[in-house]
Amino acid sequence: DNATSTDKLLPAECKHGLVVVLGESSGNWSSEYSAGYVNDWAVANGYQNTTGTYYDGGAWSYVKNEYAKLLLGYNNTMALKGYIAQNAYSSGIIEALTAYSIQKPASVSDLYIPSISEMELIYSNVGVINASLQAAGGSVLENEAYWTVSENQHSPANAATVNPMTGSLQGGKLKSATARVRFIFAF
């Protein structure tokens, strides 16, 4: 219980665990990033911080910030959807999310894009998840980068991806690039 309790936007009854959907999609994170951070808009509109990584020049690597340690995928997805809608931008992953249709009980959350921490949970359970996906006729998670809904706090042009097979975090993938995405929901 309380597996997703750090995401204050999730309905109270959806704090027990996460479900990975059977199919996957792909697309860009956002077609527009010159206007600034989604995070600036999100915080100004009452959402929790949507960043997840920063670049550590001394270590030549991307490092998780304090928000990357929280399960904030639902919060970040709702913020990205609001930002995209208000500014009339396009987002391949939001369009795919809107188009993705599954039957699910009313007592679960809407579908959303995982944050860094949620993708790390998927990575830590990928063997069981892939076996379950395969048994249910779904597509298994691949050895490739998957979008998270976490921004890079030092570059509005970048968002984080995680490889669910290796756990490898890339904090600086261009938002205009195409990558895979696997939606989840909370119960």
Task: Describe the predicted segments one by one.
Residues 98-100, 109-110, 116-187:
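C-terminal, surface-exposed recognition/capping segments
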